Amino acid sequence: MKTTINIATPTLKKPSKEANLVASIYGLLFVCGAKGITLRELIRIFKKAGIEKVKLALLALERKLADDEQSGVELKKFGNSFSLVTKPIIKDYLHLLLAHKVKNPLNSKAMEVLAIIAYNQPCTRPRINEIRGVDSFQIVDDLIAKELIVELGRTDKPGRPFIYEVSAKFYDLFGIDSLDQLPKIEHFDLDKFKQGSFFDSNRYGDE
């Protein structure tokens, strides 16, 4: 007589709503990249969950990534936006990687415009042009393409110019957590822009 052995298929545990919310926010942060995503946007997207649950999910994700020794990223808040950035522990390896791909990633003009935005944000193109004394249209577009600055919208002034601020990638690239860590304004030196060293942009050069 043939004996049939029934092997039970393990039942996969269905993720909780809280876990799904954390995972969903994690996925959105990954897709948004350097631009990041604001709390307001998250609340709009997950309006059924509510403000408090979204905040708790962000906190849970922050702790999860911080405690996970096998994760090379962490959750950071820059201004009004949340972004995924690399952990300090892998900075040295990141430098080695980029040393083969990037040397002086920004020229002097780009460094100058980037610094103007960092010190005057939120900043418009007319304001940048006013400070530099020349048109900066293409440079601003290049910085957007490099994901070092982001558009925040438009002002109500004539012409409704776009408003810009530095992105999470800016903080990550230059190894700072806030604009307070930039050189103080009393030490502001335009010559350093032209040398490409104001933000220590040469740190990804040959070692």
Swiss-Prot record:
Gene3D superfamilies: Winged helix-like DNA-binding domain superfamily/Winged helix DNA-binding domain. It is found in: Cytoplasm. Its main location: cytoplasm. Transmembrane segments: none annotated. Keywords: Cell cycle, Cell division, Chromosome partition, Cytoplasm. InterPro entries: ScpB_csome_segregation, WH-like_DNA-bd_sf, WH_DNA-bd_sf. It comes from the Bacteria. GO terms for cellular component: cytoplasm. One of its GO terms (biological process) is cell division. Belongs to the ScpB family. Homodimer. Homodimerization may be required to stabilize the binding of ScpA to the Smc head domains. Component of a cohesin-like complex composed of ScpA, ScpB and the Smc homodimer, in which ScpA and ScpB bind to the head domain of Smc. The presence of the three proteins is required for the association of the complex with DNA. Participates in chromosomal partition during cell division. May act via the formation of a condensin-like complex containing Smc and ScpA that pull DNA away from mid-cell into both cell halves. This is Segregation and condensation protein B. It comes from Mycoplasma genitalium (strain ATCC 33530 / DSM 19775 / NCTC 10195 / G37) (Mycoplasmoides genitalium). The lineage of its organism: Bacteria, Bacillati, Mycoplasmatota, Mycoplasmoidales, Mycoplasmoidaceae.
